[in-house]
Design a protein with these regions (language model features):
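Zn-dependent metallo-beta-lactamase
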Residues: 1-23
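Rieske [2Fe-2S] iron-sulfur-binding domain
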Residues: 19-107
Length: 107
């Protein structure tokens, strides 16, 4: 199994509690900086494909709420926490590597 790291931003580029949109070869993802950690996830809410850049609200802790229908997701696991059992949010492992924030891909 191999691992690749794709740089998507620089450390310090995002203020706490903010998000940035990233284009990964045509796939739109968001990068959030919450509680000192970076989280990368799908830009679209899995419920009805709402744009989380426009409709998403970062909550205390590592949660995001889609304000279109109040679905809430855990940014660490992607689990839908409200309502329980709904389709999960796609999350990608993001980590600091030196001065860069990278998405880790395993293949």
């Amino acid at each position: 199994m191999g691992v690749s790291y794709i740089p998507i931003a620089r450390v310090g580029e995002l203020a706490p509690g903010t998000m940035k949109e990233i284009d990964l070869g045509g796939r739109q993802v968001l990068l959030a900086f919450v509680e000192g950690k970076y989280f990368a996830f799908s830009r679209n809410c899995p419920h009805e494909e709402a744009d989380l850049k426009a409709a998403g609200q970062l909550l205390d802790g590592t949660k995001i709420r889609c304000n279109n229908h109040s679905y809430c997701y855990d940014l660490q696991s992607g689990e839908c926490t409200l309502p329980k059992g709904a389709a999960p949010l796609t999350v990608l492992p993001a980590e600091e590597r030196g001065a860069e924030i990278c998405i880790r891909l395993e293949w």
